[in-house]
Amino acid sequence: MVHKKKNVDIPSSQKYLGIQHVNFYSNAFGKESLRFQLRELILPIVRKETRLLYKIQSFFRNPWLDVYFMYTATLGTHVFFMLALPIFFWSGCIYYTLDITQLFAAGVYFSGCIKDYFCLPRPRSPPMVRLTLSSDAEYEYGFPSTHTTNAMATGFYSLFLLLSMSDSMSSISYYFLLSLVLLYIASISLGRIYCGMHGFMDVSTGTILGVTLAIFQWKYADFFHNVWSSSSTSVPILSVVLALFFIWFHPQPAERCICLEDSISFISVIMGIDLGTWFASPESLSHLHDNLNSYFLLKFFVRVLFGVCMILIWKSFAKQALLAVLPPIFKSLRLSYLEPKSQSEKGIRAATGSNHSPGNIGTELGVITSHQSHPHPVRFDIETIARIIVYSGIGFLCTYFAPKVFLKWKI
């Protein structure tokens, strides 16, 4: 389902998304389209929340809570999970890490689809004060809250797992971990309102979406685990086909939004993980948790050091390789219409997070350029292909290459 839009440029002075004149969205979606009608139905509800949200923020605000909620919000970001999840995987928590990674990717993808479909704004600022350590608020729509979706999905899945293990844990450990999970869920979801980043509808919809994803993942956990341990050739084929389908299916936003780029990145990571676990030998994966001994902490430190360096080297190598290879290939195949800019190199640097230049939008996963504003949007252009290669490579290296090295080095 590709949602086409007319080529409507947004003013350069426009800072936040979703607040254009109604004619902008009627031209982009079509005045009689279901998409436009639903947006017009929900928008007044979102706008009416502002006054109450401002009263709540004004009543509770103090410097300590400002710092607390701004920093705890980083626990629901892409950067935190991109750093934490490989480390959990290399520590031997294989299936839990794969479950959480898949949940996080699903949360980013489905919340991004809804955001880009409805193109609804965040709470008005002013009067709301937006408290954030990131500038991403300028480049994302508000409905629903991706932070809340991810917190609810990963938090509730962790709760389900914790409850299933309650009989085998001490009371102190159980209630300590339970408190941490509940604190995490509450801090992220309530913090979105306190920080002025989202309204009640954003958070409540994110909650419903996140809990639904957690229940689905928990119910079909055994199925996914069997897929990751399967040797059937249908696994890598279906993984690639589904990844490309989900990227194609993602709605086209009315304005330049980073949701599509984030979705492409995480769908690609999952594809890389599926391929990596399929190619990986059972010995290399079992070694991750069978190597628990008195030297485990030292060996684990070496694993993390090697793994982080591996990812950094891969990103650097992939960028340079793509800069050298992709543009000539596209030109030789006469696929210049897939190049969103006349200077393909700049576009590839942007897609792979290589540099920041005027006109680019910085994100936690890289930078985007005019990919979205191409007169005739093409989903699989050079920028998209570059992003798929880079991030699927990260997933593949973390689940295949790194465990293979750890086994060979006996660490």
Curated annotation (Swiss-Prot):
Residues 115-123 are annotated as: Phosphatase sequence motif I. One of its GO terms (cellular component) is endoplasmic reticulum membrane. CDD domains: PAP2_SPPase1. Residues 96-99, 192-195, 255-259, 315-387 are cytoplasmic. Keywords: Endoplasmic reticulum, Hydrolase, Lipid metabolism, Membrane, Sphingolipid metabolism, Transmembrane, Transmembrane helix. It comes from the Eukaryota. Signal peptide: none annotated. InterPro entries: P_Acid_Pase_2/haloperoxi_sf (IPR036938), P_Acid_Pase_2/haloperoxidase (IPR000326). Dihydrosphingosine 1-phosphate phosphatase required for efficient ceramide synthesis from exogenous sphingoid bases. Involved in endocytosis and calcium-mediated signaling. Belongs to the type 2 lipid phosphate phosphatase family. This is Dihydrosphingosine 1-phosphate phosphatase C823.11.
